[in-house]
Amino acid sequence: FIGRQGRNRRLFSVKDIKPRTEEFLKEYPVVLSTTYTAKNCIDKNWVFDYVIMDEASQVDITTGALALSCAMNAVIVGDDKQLPNVIDERTKTALKAIESAYRIDEKYRSTTHSFLQSCCEVFTDAPQTLLREHYRCHPKIIEFCNHLFYNGELVPMTQDKGEENVVTVIQTVKGQHARGHYNQREIDVIQSEVLPNLTNNGSVGIITPYRNQAEAINRQLGTKIASTVHKYQGRECDNIIMSMVDNTISEFSDDPNLLNVAIS
């Protein structure tokens, strides 16, 4: 909870919040919450003036709708070119049955749309603002994403200081080394050739499209340095090693949203 500054603030216990919502919000007008709990953290007869939802591309439609139901106005923030929410197969099967039985319009379907995508298609007249400035990656890295995914609309705010080898591609020797979303040859090359060159260059993270590969890397290196792209979204390191696993194009590893998040 974020309170008003410049005076002594009243204190509330957790049990006070629902029965004393009006008093509480006057003292603490900004409430931080997950999308799941936004509706239940205040009295059911009370609504916020605004709900601001961040990372809306990772929110499913049902949960997003619940969050909207507790506010008069909404600001939806997200990037539909990043990874959407993940639905497990059991839930997806159940949702498809419901969508088919009730002939749900495509733009409201949780199996094909994130909350952000649905809002963009439903509220076509709502004003949209592109946050163009990019502060994370080296210009040579973000320009790849900018050209491939954002139609050149991003403005890199980082500086190119003439660093060498900002982006390096290492192609492993061909062979039967990629099985079951796991590539031992890549792991060996990362351990013997890539990591030794990064020991004095800041923090290092390893990302991969597949959980099997991440687990195998961590076992071999004896540390939790690797993770899937989905779990790594939003994090950053000075150096990122991307282990693609597949030696041929696959639907999963060539997914544009996954590649955008992984590279940036």
Predicted regions and their residues:
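Conserved helicase NTPase catalytic core signature
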Residues: 1-47
